[in-house]
């Protein structure tokens, strides 16, 4: 992510955490407020209209909370238990009978006027009123405008989490369904014939009318044919020539470009696939006549007989978890896997977005293979690309050539994405937030310890940096 905000802190001290779930500001430095709500925050905060929206977990229930951006006061909260799903589908025993897997709401919110949209821990696309409920006895609770149940309406079955973040384009919402495989596939080196996809015909990306939640379009990408695990990427948007395209990173390791709808159709239609680009380098695929599903499973360091030494050297297939980034007719996107599978070789691609059809060969501008698997969305600013990997390294590359200028090793895992703003690169890790200077020379400005892991990405608005931790704390930092 990139922001034009200025005057941001290069360091802050959270201060003493108090028993009432707030920060003692007399012991803090460059902190406007800090609050603890629930057990953990996994989603990246969204800031709009003087409010902060963030999803998380409270014990075993998903939560979505709205705060006052200036004071940290909780204005309202939505909360729901995990969803029980059928234990068998089409005669198959399904390993995950609860959605999601103890991680709550992971989707980041999209805000448009007086409405806020997100995907819940129950695989529902939610539309809430940003004002919440004001009248007793419901004051402090969310006001639901509409709900679209993707599991019930589409038959999708998320693997681990339903965490896609909505994309607003006019009156339309583009949302990933998070359809995936049965988690039992990864209990042992499964053969291809043993792989279970509970919903093999469900869509991967849908479009709904943001005003009433009506389904208006679905994709027809052949992702299920090569689905590896789950689908945790989110769609993005770009204008290419006279076309508006929606980009999506598939669970098969392929980046897709769909033509955006020009208007809201009266009846559901199919999205037109403009191009596809296979982000899995040929040498990463199963060697010889090897079963590619078995090879993928053996890349999970927890599996018996694993080939993964957790040192970043394992080479194998990966899905796309990061969100594709569009800049100047180019798409930047990297491949990765669930961090629990361990480290392994990744790949970052720069793709010419002006193509048509299968552009794997002709659309390649450059590929960088010097990074580990990654979940992180890249930041592109001032001719440079910043991307972190699961191994905890931050890479700075030339955006036109892919030349690597420097690598900073934090010696800890990274799940979130970088934020570039005010001449700084903010990098979330499992041991806090690193701050580095932008540019072709490596310069570390500091590390901020927050008392918990930072899986979400930091965001900035109105001179304030917002950072959420897995301990359920949300911090608002600014120059003082």
Indicate where each model-derived feature is located.
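Noncatalytic, solvent-exposed loop/strand surfaces
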Residues: 1-480
